[in-house]
């Protein structure tokens, strides 16, 4: 082992010798040096922010050395050594340069080699501070280890395994000014500091010293700070500090000292700061500081045993004393404790057991700025306690047992800035308690039992007076959290113009109005009203912002209150929802994210942000006394402020007549009467008192069989008469409803409506007012073969022509037939003309011409379209048809309808007056209620006449046909149609419209005819391409001999057989003059071959 040790020391010596041969350099370590070291490969260097980190050996998970270098500032060497030979792994040729501080952590002492050799090896130049911290020294420290560290100013040596140090340890460190040794040292050598005449601070804390050698501090004339804390110096005497007259601060806390001699600090004549904390004092001697007239601060904190009191005049006559910190479970203090120490500025007596204070305690503290009496057991303070502390700015009295604040206690504290009296038992505050504290900025009175009420004043008067704080106009913070306050006082709003924070949380405030939130503070004010008992927040609809208003928002937190969500909070709800008057948004910003309703039951737990304003109601009556109630018996009456309505709810009350109703208050605008599910047979007169004010009448589920207009209140705007026994409504009632009802304000379903001619006014009303009738689609006719929805009917459906008309027509036809037979012989030579006349009277339909049938119609075509497709009508369809090669007369509702007429009547009239109806089918048409009604009218007209009169133009993509209206879907599946964009569009459209052509003569006059009825359908058939190949078989039809046709065309009757659809049954040709033709004229009428292509016509 001895040989191994010698070899190690020899190796280190070789390294040192090599190091001593290197030229010195003052260049600081930089990025280039770091890069070169990484290239070398023995160690790894990396820049980290403004530092460099070196790891040796390179890439090791647990490196032996980790160096952190801040050039020109510090070097930290972190060691992980198992033996002193590991120092050989330090990076070679490293030149760190000048640094101020070197710290070596967890490193071993380098054998018998100086620590300075390691610094030299690393190229560290001129350090002034060395910190050596390690619990693994490897050996005891000696003078040799500190050799060549003459330039050090500060040396800190920390270890836990060193109990003794040599007397000459510090002999070579003559320039040392600050020394710190923490090493569990049990004994201090008497000559340890003999050569340290420049030493200014000694830190020997956290050792195990039991005594100090006499005169050990006598050779250090510059010593200022002596820290001997956390040792075992139980028996200090004045001789321990002999020669230490230059010491200014001494710290002997945590030494287990139980008592001190009265003259222990006699030699410390210049001391300014003494720390006696954390000892075991049960008493202190009188005159302890009599020799220390330069005292500035004394600390006696956390005494380990109770120290009941302090000796009289302990801190008296200290001309420079400023700070006292006394926390030792003190129970009482002498009145002359600080006598004539007039420069004291800070006294901390918090966390003691004081119950009261002598009135003269602060008699001479005219310069006192801060006084801490918190966390004691004070129940009372003398009114004269602060009589002389006129410069006091900070007073802390929290966590005591004080019950009141008198009118004089703070009368001389005009400079007080902060007063904290939290967590006491305060109940009363004299109204003049803060008259003189007009400089107060922060007042904390939270967690007390303050209610601020004046017992001799009426409750209403108390809301109009100021609180005791009204004199503090410059107050910034007023903390009244967790008290018993029930009002927001006027002075908080109107006179505290600098207020920034008002905490009223956890109090007993039960209601708020606009005036309670109208703060005039010129700062951004935060008001905390959470956890009160606020049930009502009433804001007016309109407010006037006076001259005192400023633009600063008041932030009010209203969360966690038991709010009653009734009609009184309407404008508050509007403000929360953002639907508010502008003046509110400029004044308040409310926090309500946790505010929910506590009542009524239906809204319990609902966040106010989700409340709908129309659900907010209040009872009309607040008394249960029948003599005082205005609400009808068996009914519930509420006021709804949202629309200023009185709601009377008498539903399911087994009523047989409308009860007597209260008169509508002048502030109310509406009366809503609910009488659903009763047994009413009739309604009262509209002039009945109370009933005359009803604006919304709900009568569903009664037994009404009729309603007269004089039973409907004049101002009625909503009427629900569904599920009664009504069969009809007369025209006067419908006229009234037409004048007064609003959107979806009428309900008529569930009644057994009779859909006959008497129901025509009702049907027209439902068609004209489909937006007003909320249940229009559920109105059913009961007199049909099966229940039919009224919305699907037209006036022609419910009111067909009189039977008498048909009887008269039959009689006329019969008479006409008799007359024709009677005169047949007389007018034999005119038999052709007579047959034509009979044919014109529906006796010979194949000779009936279209123009003859439609000669009384004003228009060639009625155009049905959605108003959203109007550009197509105006820009294309109308110009092409009215001004094209064949000019047609069109009916367009924008131009040709009668002004003021019913829409359904205009539709029926337009269809009846037009030879064709053109349907411009699009998505807009499908969505249009009126457009679908126009189609339905045209379709039914065509069905009644047995003729095809509808031309469908598909203008745009209509989607899935299966999703269309049933009637329209069926029509499109069974009939042909045109598509906009077809190359033959205009030719096909003009061909499908009525034709007028000049033709031959009959008899003595010219007879102009259009195609036969059969050809009308054939023209429409040409809208879609015809099959290329004709059908292989002729459709079955009833063959009819037409002698008239035969005679007119020069053939025998049996040669001219016509099929009912207008086709020639023999050859599909007609042969005038013995020639066969595919098309031609018969009797002056143009006949079209229905199997011909369009190009053949």
From Swiss-Prot:
Signal peptide interval: 1-27
LRR repeat residue numbers: 175-195, 198-219, 222-243, 246-267, 270-291, 294-314, 320-340, 343-364, 367-388, 391-412, 415-436, 439-460, 474-495, 498-521, 523-544, 669-690, 693-713, 715-738
Compartments, as annotated in UniProt: Cell membrane; Cytoplasm
SMART domains, A to Z: LRR_TYP, LRRCT, LRRNT, TIR
UniProt effect for mutating residue 432 to A: 33% decrease in signaling capacity
Tissue expression pattern: In early embryos, concentrated in the pseudocleavage furrows that form transiently between nuclei before cellularization and in the cleavage furrows during cellularization (at protein level). Later, found on cells in the mesectoderm, stomodeum, proctodeum, anterior and posterior midguts, splanchnopleura, salivary gland placode and adjacent to the segmentally repeated tracheal placodes (at protein level). During and after germ band shortening, localized in a number of cell types, including the salivary gland, foregut, hindgut, Malpighian tubules and epidermis (at protein level).
Name of protein: Protein toll
Function: Component of the extracellular signaling pathway that establishes dorsal-ventral polarity in the embryo. Promotes heterophilic cellular adhesion. Involved in synaptic targeting of motoneurons RP5 and V to muscle 12 (M12); functions as a repulsive cue inhibiting motoneuron synapse formation on muscle 13 (M13) to guide RP5 and V to the neighboring M12, where its expression is repressed by tey.
Effect of residue 568 to M: In strain: MelZim1, MelZim5 and MelZim6
Domain (LRRCT) ranges: 561-620, 751-801
Cysteines joined through disulfide linkages: 34-45, 43-56, 79-107, 565-597, 567-618, 631-637, 635-650, 755-781, 757-799
Domain of life: Eukaryota
Outcome after substituting residue 98 to G: In strain: MelZim6
GO cellular component: cell surface; cleavage furrow; early endosome; external side of plasma membrane; plasma membrane
């Amino acid at each position: 082992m001895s040989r191994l040790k010698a070899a190690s020391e020899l190796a280190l010596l070789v390294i040192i010798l090599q190091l001593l041969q290197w030229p010195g350099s003052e260049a600081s370590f930089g990025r280039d040096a770091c890069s070169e070291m990484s290239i070398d490969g023995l160690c790894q260097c990396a820049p980290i922010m403004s530092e460099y980190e070196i790891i040796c050996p390179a890439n090791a998970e647990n490196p032996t050395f980790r160096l952190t270098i801040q050039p020109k500032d510090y070097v930290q060497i972190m060691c992980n050594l198992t033996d002193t030979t590991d120092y050989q792994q330090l990076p070679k040729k490293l030149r760190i340069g000048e640094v101020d501080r070197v710290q070596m952590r967890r490193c071993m002492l380098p054998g018998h080699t100086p620590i300075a050799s390691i610094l030299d090896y690393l190229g560290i130049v001129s350090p002034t501070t060395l910190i050596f911290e390690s619990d693994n020294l490897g050996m005891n420290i000696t003078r040799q280890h500190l050799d060549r560290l003459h330039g050090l100013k500060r040396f800190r040596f920390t270890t836990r395994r060193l109990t003794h140090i040599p007397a000459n340890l510090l002999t070579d460190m003559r320039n040392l000014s600050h020394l710190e040794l923490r090493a569990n040292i049990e004994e201090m050598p008497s000559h340890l500091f003999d050569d340290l005449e420049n030493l200014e601070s000694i830190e020997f804390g956290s050792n195990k010293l039991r005594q100090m050698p006499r005169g050990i501090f006598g050779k250090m004339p510059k010593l200022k700070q002596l820290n001997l804390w956390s040792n075992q110096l139980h028996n200090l005497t004045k001789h321990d500090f002999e020669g230490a007259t230059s010491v200014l601060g001494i710290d002997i806390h945590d030494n287990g000292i139980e008592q001190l001699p009265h003259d222990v600090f006699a030699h410390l004549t210049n001391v300014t700061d003494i720390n006696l904390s954390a000892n075991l004092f049960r008493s202190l001697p009188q005159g302890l500081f009599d020799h220390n007239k330069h005292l500035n601060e004394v600390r006696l904190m956390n005494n380990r045993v109770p120290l009941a009191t302090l000796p009289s005049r302990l801190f008296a006559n200290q001309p420079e004393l400023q700070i006292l910190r006394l926390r030792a479970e003190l129970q009482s203090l002498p009145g002359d404790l600080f006598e004539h120490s007039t420069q004291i500025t800070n006294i901390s007596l918090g966390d003691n057991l004081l119950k009261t204070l002598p009135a003269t305690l602060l008699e001479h503290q005219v310069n006192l700025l801060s006084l801490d009496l918190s966390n004691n057991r004070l129940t009372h303070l003398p009114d004269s306690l602060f009589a002389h502390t006129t410069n006091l700015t900070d007073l802390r009295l929290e966590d005591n047992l004080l019950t009141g604040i008198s009118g004089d206690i703070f009368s001389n504290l005009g400079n007080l800035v902060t007063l904290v009296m939290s967590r006491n038992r305060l109940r009363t505050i004299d109204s003049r308690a803060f008259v003189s504290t007009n400089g107060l900025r922060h007042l904390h009175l939270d967690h007390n039992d303050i209610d601020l009420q004046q017992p001799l004043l009426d409750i209403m008067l108390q809301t109009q007076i100021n609180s005791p704080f009204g004199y503090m106009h410059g107050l910034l913070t007023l903390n009244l959290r967790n008290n018993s306050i029930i009002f927001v006082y006027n002075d908080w709003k109107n006179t505290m113009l600098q207020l920034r924070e008002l905490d009223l949380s956890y109090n007993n405030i039960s209601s708020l109005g606009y005036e309670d939130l109208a703060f005039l503070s010129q700062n951004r004010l935060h008001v905390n009203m959470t956890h009160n008992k606020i049930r009502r927040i009433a804001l007016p609809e309109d407010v006037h912002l006076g001259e005192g208003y400023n633009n600063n928002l008041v932030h009010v937190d209203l969360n966690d209150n038991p709010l009653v969500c009734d009609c009184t909070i309407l404008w508050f709800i509007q403000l929360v929802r953002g639907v508010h008057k502008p003046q509110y948004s400029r004044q308040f910003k409310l926090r309500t994210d946790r505010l929910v309703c506590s009542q009524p039951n239906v809204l319990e737990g609902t966040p106010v942000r989700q409340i709908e304003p129309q659900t907010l109601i209040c009872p009309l009556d607040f008394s249960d006394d029948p003599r005082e109630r205005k609400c009808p018996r068996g009914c519930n009456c509420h006021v709804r402020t949202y629309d200023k309505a009185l709601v009377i709810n008498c539903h399911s009350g087994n009523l047989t007549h409308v009860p007597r109703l209260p008169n509508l208050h002048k502030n109310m605008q509406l009366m809503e009467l609910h009488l659903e599910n009763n047994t009413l047979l009739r309604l009262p007169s509209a002039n009945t008192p109370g009933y005359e004010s009803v604006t919304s009448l709900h009568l569903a589920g009664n037994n009404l069989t009729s309603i007269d207009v004089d039973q409907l209140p004049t101002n009625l705007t909503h009427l629900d008469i569904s599920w009664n026994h009504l069969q009809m409504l007369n025209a006067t009632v419908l006229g009234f409803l037409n004048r007064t009802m609003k959107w979806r304000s009428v309900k008529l379903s569930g009644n057994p409506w009779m859909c006959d001619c008497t129901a025509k006014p009702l049907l027209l009303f439902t068609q004209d007012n489909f937006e007003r009738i909320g249940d229009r689609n559920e109105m059913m006719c009961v007199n049909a073969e099966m229940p039919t929805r009224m919305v699907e009917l037209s006036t022609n459906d419910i009111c067909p022509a009189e039977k008498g008309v048909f009887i008269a027509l039959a009689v006329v036809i019969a008479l006409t037939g008799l007359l024709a037979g009677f005169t047949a012989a007389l007018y034999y030579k005119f038999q052709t003309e007579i047959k034509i006349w009979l044919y014109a009277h529906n006796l010979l339909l194949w000779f009936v011409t279209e123009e003859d049938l439609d000669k009384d119609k004003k228009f060639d075509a009625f155009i049905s379209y959605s108003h959203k497709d109007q550009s197509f009508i105006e820009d294309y369809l109308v110009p092409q048809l009215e001004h094209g090669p064949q000019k047609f007369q069109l009916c367009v509702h924008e131009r040709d309808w009668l002004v003021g007429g019913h829409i359904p009547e205009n539709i029926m009239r337009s269809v009846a007056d037009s030879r064709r109806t053109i349907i411009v089918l699009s998505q807009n048409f499908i969505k249009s209620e009126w457009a679908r009604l126009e189609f339905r009218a045209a379709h039914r007209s065509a069905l009644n006449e047995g003729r095809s009169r509808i031309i469908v133009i598909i203008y745009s993509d209509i989607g899935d046909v299966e999703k269309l209206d049933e009637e329209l879907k069926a029509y499109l599946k069974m009939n042909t149609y045109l598509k906009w964009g077809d190359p033959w569009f205009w030719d096909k459209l003009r061909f499908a419209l009525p034709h007028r052509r000049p033709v031959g003569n009959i008899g003595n006059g010219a007879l102009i005819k259009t195609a036969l009825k059969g050809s009308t359908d054939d023209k429409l058939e040409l809208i879609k391409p015809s099959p290329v190949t004709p059908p292989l078989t002729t459709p079955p039809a009833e063959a009819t001999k037409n002698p008239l046709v035969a005679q007119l065309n020069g053939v025998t009757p049996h040669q001219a057989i016509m099929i009912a659809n207008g086709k020639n049954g023999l050859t599909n040709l007609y042969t005038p003059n013995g020639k066969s033709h595919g098309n031609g004229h018969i009797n002056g009428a143009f006949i079209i071959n229905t199997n011909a292509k369009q190009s053949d016509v």
